[in-house]
Amino acid sequence: MFTIRPDEISSVIRDQIQKYNTELQVTNVGTVLQVGDGIARVYGLEKCMASELLEFEDGTIGIALNLEEDNVGAVLMGAGRTIEEGSTVRATGRIASIPVGPAFLGRVVNALAIPIDGKGDIVGSETRLLESPAPGIIKRKSVYEPLATGITAIDAMIPIGRGQRELIIGDRQTGKTTIAIDTILNQKGKGVVCVYVAIGQKASTVAQIVEVLRSRGALEYTIIVAANANEPAALQYLAPYTGCTLGEYVMYNGLTLPGSDKKINAALLVYDDLSKQAVAYRQMSLLLRRPPGREAYPGDVFYLHSRLLERAAKLSPDLGEGSLTALPIIETQAGDVSAYIPTNVISITDGQIFLDSGLFNSGLRPAIDAGISVSRVGGAAQTKAMKKVAGKLRLDLAQFSELEAFSQFASDLDKATQAQLARGLRLREILKQPQYSPLSVAQQVAIIYAATNGYLDDIDVKGIQPFKQQFLNYLDSSVSEYGQEIETTKALTDKAVDLLKKALNDFKTTVKK
């Protein structure tokens, strides 16, 4: 028969008393009033903060965007199909933040920095807020280091510096993404970490870009953030901030690439494209019943982009001179750069590269319209060698454009005008460049020097591209001294000019034979 021992009972009671926790847990809880279209209205949550993360019963995360008198309007970061009216919502007390660190290199993540490439979890070295304040005036330094894109037309006429924000703008299918990807490919071995943010794109397009970067060895220094077209508007809205936060970690903290012991603190960010982010934000704002403004965008759509792009900077020496360069992409409709979003982003950035569909269809690729493309601060970052040859190129091309328009109406042209037109055609031809084939500064300087100094005048226009390719191959293999001279001095020295002239004359002689 079972006997009850008083000492056992007393020890159990004593244990229970000792384990008893008097600590109270206070949770801010609300109730779902209405849910649908990626938006939830929640009653309660009196102490909710703006942009606070909310957790729904089914595990879906939301962000509180509208704080109204009697309810909170939240956007859902998932489908939210199992959220029911009347279910409870818990305020987490946290603002949206993501893990950051070197482990993200070579990975594809979503807008919440969760890996989507099937290569396992990523362990971040620290956590950063998605919305961080941009560096102030004292924390910045003016742009002075070049960020070479490898595209001759850009590096010569619209140079980009580290810490600059240069807009790439044009109609669909004019080569905007190609310029961005070429720039990423050209950073190989140059100590720059790249972040490519794909907003509202097809998953197949993103997969194609990942494959291009992987096959050319660029994925090891690149992070890809993807919020595809089928994902909720909230994730498409957040993706650029996620990419920016990952880039900011590099700018402020620096990191070492695999197989290298050198710490790098320069980052390049591509937002492809901010038009789709603005559309996602408009969708969210209209569903939250915010008043619509021009083109039905909310009144704070300028602030949406300005607070993102102002985070790109060149830091002062006190902060380590890190840099975050931004290449936002904007898609125009029928070349209309005076629409709301294009004008907003043009006014925020330090210059724009305008791509023209007419030029693209005529065979000029990259289809850069040099007339309305500009770099407001990049000139200070251009290397001396490029500056020396680019001035003449820009002037000759401007005169050629004027003459070309005039020559359409004139029947008889004098010899000097004909020679100028012929030179202009050859200059335009050397600026053509195939996809995914960036050139080094030395190669760009060589071909511009050859064209502006008349070395290509006796070559047929159709033969310019083959000549350019063969000459650059010859220069790399037989006159490697020239490349080394440009690389070490960053200037077109007398020695470099002599080597280049000799190489051009020797090569033309062998070609004629």
Curated annotation (Swiss-Prot):
EC category: translocase
Subcellular location: Cell inner membrane
Taxonomy, superkingdom: Bacteria
Alphabetized UniProt keyword annotations: ATP synthesis, ATP-binding, Cell inner membrane, Cell membrane, CF(1), Hydrogen ion transport, Ion transport, Membrane, Nucleotide-binding, Translocase, Transport
GO molecular function, one term: proton-transporting ATP synthase activity, rotational mechanism
GO biological process, one term: proton motive force-driven ATP synthesis
Marked site: Required for activity: S373
EC number of this enzyme: 7.1.2.2
Family note: Belongs to the ATPase alpha/beta chains family.
Role description: Produces ATP from ADP in the presence of a proton gradient across the membrane. The alpha chain is a regulatory subunit.
Subunit structure: F-type ATPases have 2 components, CF(1) - the catalytic core - and CF(0) - the membrane proton channel. CF(1) has five subunits: alpha(3), beta(3), gamma(1), delta(1), epsilon(1). CF(0) has four main subunits: a(1), b(1), b'(1) and c(9-12).
Protein name per UniProt: ATP synthase subunit alpha
Organism: Gloeobacter violaceus (strain ATCC 29082 / PCC 7421)
Annotated gene: atpA
